[in-house]
């Protein structure tokens, strides 16, 4: 009898569960249908507006004209060049495709479109990821499976072989590297991406060109018009004065800021490498032509323009030639030009500077500059936290970011194509007894695997034997211990490494802003040491984390017993939670909570009645987060377990997303 009753009870429970699932599915489908209908209506309205092109352009132009002219004349004082700029802006507007204009109108109507909780980025080198642009197009389904709707195509414009600086020495701003494809392939790719609602980002190198650029070739031959587009000097007098105040970017691999050209009989300014010549933005012709290049690329379907090395673009004798006021004038003008011609475009600033020098590149709420900036300092501080198991500096850094206006959007990432520079808040660390030089050495030793308790692997970049300074290179997985565990065939260590990797991603998703994955991180891809076999790469250890995408490993992502499957499934779960919970929008209230445990970080998010608390253990030991949220019960969105948000016990490298019930 009892067995029958139990069977009836189980059956009733199953029917109840099935009914709840059916109702949830029906609700989700209804919401999806309503969203599709709203999007269709918005698109129809946008297409209608597209028919009013001329009046739309005039409205945008008139809105910005006074400020744009004021700033241009303040910088250049040249009416004819300003008139030429305005004429070409209108030309590029009329050349812009109907589909891109429709997208512009839709984004104008919803200016916070990129701040939603479904915005997820991925960056990759085209050749490493899929061979060429057609290959990337064939992999869009994979990108969708990664829950990514924004891809950053690392530099793909034409560069000279062997002197490309990873694509940042551009020889032609209107030509794609032959091995990667053509401009037509780029347009095909952006069109295919837009059909899948994937946004495309590219690098726009404003500070310099390759010495193989047509301008540079003419300048080298002695053409004064083109020499004036760079910084040429026929003796060492003025360059020597610059060297007194301008820091070196690469003091060991490319010392100094000038290069002697024997065939030209002149010095030329080269802040980065000798084959990258700094552009002279004092010349209005340089600004105008670079804006035309910007608009040309925007019209190819690019959604996000990453302005490379933006703090460097204005030079002034007697200064550091970094972060000068004129830089902000140029970025502000670029923002307005974009809002007039192609308002669907976003400007992403690459500002690798101290925190107080980064934020000004957002501009002000009234006069904005960049839409988004990289959260460089928080990234470096995150890895400091991994090495020290002490969240105090990271908590302070997050508090600063969380205190900024909600209009300011950071891109958050764990790793990227570049090295990690240890630009930390050393005055604060000094109060904890940490000295800058010795702490940098500790961090580099730790992540190379030299410290006794380290599981990380990687290499140094640009090490200076005199100062002891160096930067670090490695993939997220290798820095978390996946490489070491795999080499030693230690299954337990591998589980710990994957949990650590996932914890860091869960924490990154909880930050204010937009998360960006580095391609390969979704399958825990480790360091690639084969770069040492290539003479063009062997001297640059950054290529250790620029390895080709391993599609054989990626194919294992569907097997939950593999390293790739565990990582991919874990990330997918986090991404699905982020997309489904409105508290993850970029403009949500975000704050940190004191845990009274130096190895545990706690972040709160609140939006429109929803509250989520993230708890992250940066230690290899079980800990307790001594928080005390007394406003009710919580449920962990990851495990589904109901919990109290008070005295939370959390396992080694564990993570919780606690949502208030």
Q: Where are these predicted regions, by residue range?
A:
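Active-site and adjacent substrate-binding regions of carbohydrate-active enzymes
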Residues: 2-5, 38, 42-661
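Long, low-complexity, compositionally biased polyampholytic IDRs enriched for Lys/Glu and Gln/Arg
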Residues: 6-46
């Amino acid at each position: 009898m009892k067995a029958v009753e139990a069977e009836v009870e189980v059956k009733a429970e199953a029917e109840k569960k099935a009914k709840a699932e059916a109702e949830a599915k029906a609700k989700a489908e209804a919401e999806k249908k309503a969203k599709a209908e709203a999007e269709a209506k918005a698109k129809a309205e946008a297409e209608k507006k597209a028919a009013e092109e001329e009046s739309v352009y005039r409205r945008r132009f008139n809105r910005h004209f006074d400020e744009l002219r004021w700033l241009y004349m303040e910088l250049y004082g040249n009416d004819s060049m300003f008139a030429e700029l305005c004429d070409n802006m209108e030309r590029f507007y009329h050349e812009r495709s109907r589909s891109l204009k429709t997208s512009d109108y839709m984004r104008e109507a919803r200016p916070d479109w990129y701040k939603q909780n479904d915005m997820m980025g991925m960056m990759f080198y085209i050749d490493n990821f899929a061979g060429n642009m057609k290959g990337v197009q064939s992999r869009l389904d994979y990108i969708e499976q990664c829950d990514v709707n924004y891809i950053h195509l690392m530099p793909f414009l034409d560069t000279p072989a062997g002197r490309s600086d990873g694509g940042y020495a551009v020889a032609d701003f209107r030509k794609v590297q032959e091995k990667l494809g053509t401009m037509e392939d780029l347009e095909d790719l952006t069109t295919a991406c837009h059909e899948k609602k994937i946004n495309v980002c590219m690098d726009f190198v404003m500070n310099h060109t390759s010495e193989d650029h047509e301008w540079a070739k003419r300048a080298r031959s002695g053409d004064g018009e083109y020499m004036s587009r760079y910084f040429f000097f026929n003796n060492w007098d003025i360059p020597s004065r610059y060297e007194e105040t301008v820091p070196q970017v690469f003091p060991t691999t490319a010392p100094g800021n000038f290069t002697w050209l024997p065939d030209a009989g002149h010095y030329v300014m080269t802040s980065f490498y000798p084959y990258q010549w700094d552009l002279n933005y004092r010349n209005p012709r340089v600004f105008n032509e670079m804006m035309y290049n910007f608009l040309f690329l925007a019209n190819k379907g690019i959604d996000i323009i990453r302005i490379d090395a933006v703090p460097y673009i204005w030079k002034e004798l007697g200064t550091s030639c970094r972060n000068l006021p004129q830089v902000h004038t140029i970025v502000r003008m670029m923002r307005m030009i974009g809002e007039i011609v192609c308002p669907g475009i976003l400007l992403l600033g690459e500002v690798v500077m101290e925190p107080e020098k980064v934020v000004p590149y957002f501009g002000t709420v009234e006069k904005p500059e960049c839409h988004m900036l990289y959260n460089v300092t928080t990234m470096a501080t995150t890895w400091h936290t991994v090495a020290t198991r002490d969240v105090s500096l990271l908590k302070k850094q997050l508090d600063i970011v969380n205190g900024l206006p909600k209009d300011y959007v950071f891109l958050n990432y764990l790793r990227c194509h570049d090295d990690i520079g240890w630009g930390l808040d050393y005055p604060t660390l000094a109060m904890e007894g940490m000295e800058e030089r010795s702490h940098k050495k500790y961090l580099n030793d730790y992540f190379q695997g030299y410290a006794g308790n380290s599981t990380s692997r990687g290499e140094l970049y640009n090490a200076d034997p005199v100062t002891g300074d160096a930067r670090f290179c490695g993939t997220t997985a290798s820095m978390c211990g996946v490489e070491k565990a795999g080499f030693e065939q230690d299954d337990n260590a591998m589980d710990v490494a994957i949990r650590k990797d996932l914890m860091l991603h869960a924490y990154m998703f909880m930050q204010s802003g937009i998360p960006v994955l580095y391609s390969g991180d979704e399958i825990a891809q480790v360091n690639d040491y084969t770069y040492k076999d290539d003479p063009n790469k062997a001297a640059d250890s950054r290529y250790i984390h620029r390895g080709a995408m391993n599609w054989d490993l990626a194919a294992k992502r569907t097997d939950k017993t593999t390293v790739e499957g565990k990582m991919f499934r874990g990330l997918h779960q986090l991404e699905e939670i982020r997309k489904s919970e409105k508290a993850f929008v970029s403009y949500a209230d975000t704050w940190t909570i004191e845990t009274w445990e130096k190895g545990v970080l706690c972040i709160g998010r609140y939006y429109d009645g929803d509250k989520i608390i993230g708890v992250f253990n940066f230690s290899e030991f079980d800990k307790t987060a001594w928080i005390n949220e007394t406003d009710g019960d919580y449920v962990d969105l990851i495990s589904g377990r109901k919990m109290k948000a008070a005295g939370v016990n959390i396992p080694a490298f564990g993570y919780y997303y606690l949502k208030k019930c």
